[in-house]
Amino acid sequence: MAKKITGYVKLQVPAGAANPSPPIGPALGQRGLNIMEFCKAFNAKTAQIEKGTPIPVIITAYQDRSFTFEMKQPPVSFFLKKAAGMKIGKKPASGSKTPGKGAPAGRISEAQIREIAEKKMPDLNCDSVDSAVAMIRGSARAMGLEITG
């Protein structure tokens, strides 16, 4: 018989930097899950990923207090900032204050957008790469990025 699922926890955790402090500790503690077990497993799985990359993770909690977790690709905004050469660090660079008006926050090429769309394709809710490209283009414009050739 399959284990009974008691809930899901969605978090965005920096690669290789999971620790029991908020937001991870309280989110898992409420479900009665072993926080350190998750932190060790997550850090081991993300060891090969660039440290600090935000990784969306969905944790499935079971009635017997065990869990499984599934990692997704980093957010589109992370890929766009990286491709546009915007600062990514403790305090992430924000997009333009008024997208479409004034100076752009950065520049990104169509080729870079297609590459991001192909990477994110499994996580996006679309059928073709072209529709994924359109979604990424919209995100880039909303961030105040200028799309070139």
Curated annotation (Swiss-Prot):
Signal peptide per UniProt: none
PANTHER family the UniProt entry points to: 60S RIBOSOMAL PROTEIN L12, LARGE RIBOSOMAL SUBUNIT PROTEIN UL11M
CDD domains on file: Ribosomal_L11
Posttranslational modification: One or more lysine residues are methylated.
Organism: Methylobacterium sp. (strain 4-46)
Keywords: Methylation, Ribonucleoprotein, Ribosomal protein, RNA-binding, rRNA-binding
Entry keyword annotation includes Ribonucleoprotein: yes
InterPro entries assigned to the protein according to its UniProt record, in alphabetical order: Ribosomal_uL11, Ribosomal_uL11_bac-typ, Ribosomal_uL11_C, Ribosomal_uL11_C_sf, Ribosomal_uL11_N, Ribosomal_uL11_N_sf
Gene Ontology terms, MF aspect: large ribosomal subunit rRNA binding; structural constituent of ribosome
UniProt GO BP: translation
A cellular component term, taken from the record's GO annotations: cytosolic large ribosomal subunit
Family: Belongs to the universal ribosomal protein uL11 family.
Functional summary from the UniProt entry: Forms part of the ribosomal stalk which helps the ribosome interact with GTP-bound translation factors.
Name this protein carries in UniProt: Large ribosomal subunit protein uL11
Subunit relationships: Part of the ribosomal stalk of the 50S ribosomal subunit. Interacts with L10 and the large rRNA to form the base of the stalk. L10 forms an elongated spine to which L12 dimers bind in a sequential fashion forming a multimeric L10(L12)X complex.
